[in-house]
Design a protein with these regions (language model features):
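Gly/Gly-Pro- and Ser/Thr-rich, intrinsically disordered tail segments characteristic of DNA damage-repair
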Residues: 1-295, 454-485
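Residues at or immediately flanking beta-strands
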Residues: 180-182, 349, 423
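Short aromatic/hydrophobic contact patches that present stacked aromatics
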Residues: 148, 390, 423
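Short, Lys/Arg-enriched charge-dense amphipathic segments
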Residues: 135-139, 159-171, 202-215, 301-307, ...
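Short, internal active-site loops enriched in acidic
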Residues: 152-154, 187-192, 352-359, 427-433
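C-terminal hydrophobic structural anchor segments
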Residues: 407, 411-480
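DNA-contacting surface of Y-family translesion DNA polymerases
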Residues: 2, 11, 232, 238-419, ...
């Protein structure tokens, strides 16, 4: 039995968060409006950040590509038109309740361009609502739309059950922001997450439309040991599912039974460790409904190494020089991020992913003689470029980091190929005060002009101070007028 048996956790997930925000901004009902959040100015291959619940009813997944939405809505309209006397629509609507009442209307939807700053604003407002009830040290923000809470010591204070407390917070969020949410309650972090992700979808909503589900280790085994597919469970991806099913394990109950098999049996713990290595331990714990990690453990965790970075998929293939401008912009933004967080680094990593057109365009293809790899969609592309630049000292200097990145770019990127993905990462990141407090010792010799060296170091120090002032001014302007100022 885990050490969390006396704990009570709540997980809250904001329903179709991005789509709900866009609906509220338009004074539309998030539950009945057909809306997708996607940048239609790119291509129809762009991924939708969110799909509203009423569109999901048609079988459109939450992370569909825009062309999949277009195709599915077209199919739905073909099906609807077949039932009409003249097989012709008299109008259209993006509202599910109106579409149910009027079969003569075709299905349409609103396409909203993503606005991350707006979503962050809503998320912060909602987090502030949670803070009215729960102290920050008892919360873990899992993502922009999901949070975990340890409410063990709050229930007696508020004279509420965990379900009543979860419902109260969700109702406050709905009344103040218009965003609906779902909650899961469990005796550990895993169980509250699974209760929210799987069980809450099938429970009846309360009078305010709030869905809350509860699990402990025994009800988890009773309700979910036979649940399929395995990918519905936290931390089980398609790769895990494929491996498990190839071994004849289709449910969490199968995994739990496998873990207690004897050494002479085919199905035993060793089989799982052969498939997943040390990660099998977590999978076995979760199969039984165990999770030893607490929110206090998460908040107290200090990683051995830190990194900070960003990546982007370009909306169309870029040539060498255009991509270089993107790399320059991303590096500049990365350095400002380091300065804002008072961090320094001595290692930069650059990743460049090439576009499929490099192999489909005959003129480019004949110039390329390098390695070819299949991407995650099974398409063949030139092998991506990856490189690391090590700096002499830990720094947040724009000049030093930019020189290192651009030199790396020139060395590793094929000038003849078109680029589709770029990522820039600062590794081995530490607090700048840790570096400033370190004392450096230099071995002196008879041949160095130490006066000239001191003057050079003084000039470099002055340049660095001037650069830092400029960086701070840039950050102040961005803080006031936005990142694009």
């Amino acid at each position: 039995m885990s050490g969390n048996e006396n704990h009570i956790y709540i997980a809250i997930d904001l329903k179709s968060f991005y789509a709900s925000v866009e609906c509220r901004e338009r004074d539309l009902d998030p539950l009945t409006t057909n809306l997708v959040v996607a940048d239609a100015e790119r291509t129809e291959k762009t991924i939708c950040l969110a799909v509203s619940p009423s569109l999901k009813v048609y079988g459109i997944p939450g992370r569909a590509r825009l062309f999949e939405v277009v195709q599915r809505v077209k199919e739905v309209n073909q099906e609807r038109s077949q039932k009409l006397p003249k097989r012709m629509f008299e109008g259209s609507s993006c509202f599910s309740d109106e579409l149910k009442e009027h079969p003569e209307l075709s299905v349409t939807y609103v396409t909203a361009k993503p606005r991350m700053a707006l979503y962050m604003k809503y998320s912060t407002q909602i987090y502030d609502i949670y803070l009215r009830y729960i102290a920050p040290e008892d919360m873990h923000v899992y993502s922009i739309d999901e949070v975990f809470m340890d409410v063990t010591h709050y229930l007696n204070t508020y004279h509420m059950t965990a379900k009543e407390l979860a419902s109260k917070m969700i109702l406050d969020v709905m009344q103040e922001t218009g965003i609906t949410a779902t909650a899961g309650i469990g005796t550990n972090l895993y169980l509250c997450k699974v209760a929210m992700d799987i069980v809450a979808k099938h429970v009846a909503p309360d009078a305010n439309g709030v869905r809350v589900a509860e699990l402990d280790e025994m009800t988890y085994r009773k309700l979910l040991w036979s649940h399929r597919p395995l990918t519905d469970f936290w931390r089980v991806g398609h790769g895990y599912r494929k491996k498990l099913e190839e071994a004849g394990l289709y449910t969490m109950g199968d995994i739990a039974r496998c873990s207690i098999g004897e050494e002479r049996d085919y199905y035993n713990e060793e089989l799982l460790y052969k498939m997943f290595g040390i990660n099998a331990e977590l999978l076995i714990d979760h199969a039984w409904g165990y999770e030893p990690v607490t929110i206090a453990d998460i908040r107290g965790y200090k990683p051995e190494t830190n990194s900070i970075g960003s990546g982007q998929v370009l909306h169309c293939p870029y040539d060498f020089e255009k991509t270089k401008l993107i790399v320059r912009e991303m590096t500049d933004a990365l350095v400002l991020d380091l300065v804002e967080k008072k961090l320094v680094t001595d290692q930069i990593v650059l990743d460049i992913g090439y576009d499929i057109e490099n192999l489909t365009n005959p003129d480019i293809r004949k110039k390329y003689h390098g390695e070819v790899k299949a991407d995650r969609y099974g398409r063949f592309v030139p092998k991506h470029a990856h490189g690391t630049a090590n700096l002499d000292t830990k720094t947040s200097s724009t000049a030093k980091i930019m020189d290192a990145v651009l030199d790396l770019y020139e060395r590793i990127v094929d000038k003849n190929l078109l680029v589709r993905r770029v990522s820039v990462t600062a590794n081995r990141v530490v607090d700048e005060h840790m570096v400033s407090n370190e004392t450096e010792f230099t071995q002196m010799d008879l041949f160095t002009d130490y006066q000239a060296l001191a003057e050079k170091q003084k000039a470099e120090q002055a340049r660095m101070e001037k650069e830092r002032r400029l960086q701070n001014v840039t950050l102040a302007i961005q803080d006031r007028y936005g990142k694009n100022a």
